[in-house]
């Protein structure tokens, strides 16, 4: 019996919508990363993108435990000398709530071209509206 290897052109990808209201950030991100990789499928192949498309709504209502709301700090650099910037979790939720989930999930995906392809299948929206109704996404309860 030969080992099954998924081919990129034969992979069937589904669309799912996840409501992030009240969900813990890390626990949500691990499940999203696993599904973006396709690890929940029987035909999972490490070097082939077998994951599904995932739409996350209500990203502004995601929760963190403990004092992370004020203690967790996000850093980025503008590219200019002395251009290091920082913001707490609370400030990031107010400024760009989508980025909080995107950063958490991106860190859990492989680094390189395959990981970037997997990350492109994640669509995050701050509110409850999304623009992917034509894909008829199924509700995924995490």
From Swiss-Prot:
Pfam families (alphabetical): Ribosomal_L13 (PF00572)
**Keyword terms:** Ribonucleoprotein, Ribosomal protein
Q: What InterPro entries does the record tag this protein with?
A: Ribosomal_uL13 (IPR005822), Ribosomal_uL13_bac-type (IPR005823), Ribosomal_uL13_CS (IPR023563), Ribosomal_uL13_sf (IPR036899)
Q: Does the keyword Metal-binding apply?
A: no
**Molecular-function annotations in GO:** mRNA binding; structural constituent of ribosome
SUPFAM superfamilies membership: Ribosomal protein L13
- Superkingdom per UniProt: Bacteria
GO BP annotation list: negative regulation of translation; translation
* Cellular component terms per the entry's GO annotation: cytosolic large ribosomal subunit
The UniProt family comment states:
Belongs to the universal ribosomal protein uL13 family.
This chain's protein is named Large ribosomal subunit protein uL13
Q: Which organism is it from?
A: Mannheimia succiniciproducens (strain KCTC 0769BP / MBEL55E)
